[in-house]
From Swiss-Prot:
Superkingdom assignment: Archaea
Known EC number: 4.2.1.33
Listed pathway(s): Amino-acid biosynthesis; L-leucine biosynthesis; L-leucine from 3-methyl-2-oxobutanoate: step 2/4
SUPFAM superfamilies the record matches: LeuD/IlvD-like
Similarity comment: family membership: Belongs to the LeuD family. LeuD type 2 subfamily.
GO BP annotations, alphabetical order: L-leucine biosynthetic process
Biological role stated in the UniProt entry: Catalyzes the isomerization between 2-isopropylmalate and 3-isopropylmalate, via the formation of 2-isopropylmaleate.
Subunit structure: Heterodimer of LeuC and LeuD.
Record-given protein name: 3-isopropylmalate dehydratase small subunit
Amino acid sequence: MIIEGPVIKFGDKIDTDIIIPARYLKYTDPQYLAQHAMEPLDPEFYKKASKGVIIVAGKVFGMGSSREQAAIALKAAGVKAVVAESFARIFYRNAINNGLPVITLPNSTKEIDENSYVKIDVETGEILVGNKVLKGKGITGMALEILQAGGIMEYLKKMQTVNRN
């Protein structure tokens, strides 16, 4: 699974209240949530992300309260993947379950510049930036299968169909 696109960069400790503020949690429409993704840091994020971007961030991306809407909002906004030094565990699972690839890369914010164009091999974790290859932690096994299906619901539907035959 290869993903590529331009980079939008954020720092450390981007919590779920920043990814999607609590006042929008009563809404369920992914496109509505997308319009408010990252709003506290960048009110124009939705417009920038709409063409398809890769977020590069620092430590503990997705920390804070558990909210599935954070991954939903990012994906619906046009985020193709998130590369970070580390992720909050619950955000990591929510991202996979919603079909949003998340790659752990040491020193991600030092290695990749804003507006760089990156190409990511999700399975191996290799990230091509210009002529430099960085080695992140790839996604394998069932998590990769869930991503390839487009998320946990699509994966379960696929498994149900396979089991019927």
